[in-house]
């Protein structure tokens, strides 16, 4: 039984939960983190009973930057793998007219994830091991009128992950960039997605698990 631990940030998302299942099935213990951990109680029980692993729940808010260092230090143990599934899409038209909404999108997709990963990157570097998995998006590959605020925030996170990977490459720390396209999740419920090229959360979760095991740098 593999007793390594995986921390999943933004654990309430569909992709995060699917990813958790793949690691749990392989025997990894889980640390599930989200803003409202009460909604994770049922998942904790399910994982523990189904996979015979240890699961702990932790309150985490990506936008509360000042709390990130405390969060990292308060975990029962430093995880071996961290998956960041934090993110927010919003509506482009509303984001264009409301700077506070736009700021929330940018902070949720870039500033918050980059902040918490910076803290754990230093801890992993000191230990000499670990894997950081950041879920970005192909929307960050090119600016488009219909989603450039969301896309630009993801572009920033993609570049951050690339630089972090280069920095830590010789330090025993692996950084994975995940770039999903269309995925049928709660976040895309209000969007009409092209069925032929739309993935399911399980496809992404499996790809993340395989990337960690095979030490793949970039996953589409």
Over which residues does each language-model region extend?
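Conserved glycine-rich cofactor-binding loop
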Residues: 12-14
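Conserved glycine-rich Rossmann-like NAD(P)H-binding loop of the short-chain dehydrogenase/reductase
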Residues: 26-42
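Rossmann-fold cofactor-recognition segment
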Residues: 49-66
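Conserved mid-core segment of classical short-chain dehydrogenase/reductases
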Residues: 87-103, 146
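Active-site helix of classical SDR
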Residues: 117, 153
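Residue(s) in the substrate-gating loop at a strand-loop-helix junction
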Residues: 137
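C-terminal helical subdomain
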Residues: 177, 193-220
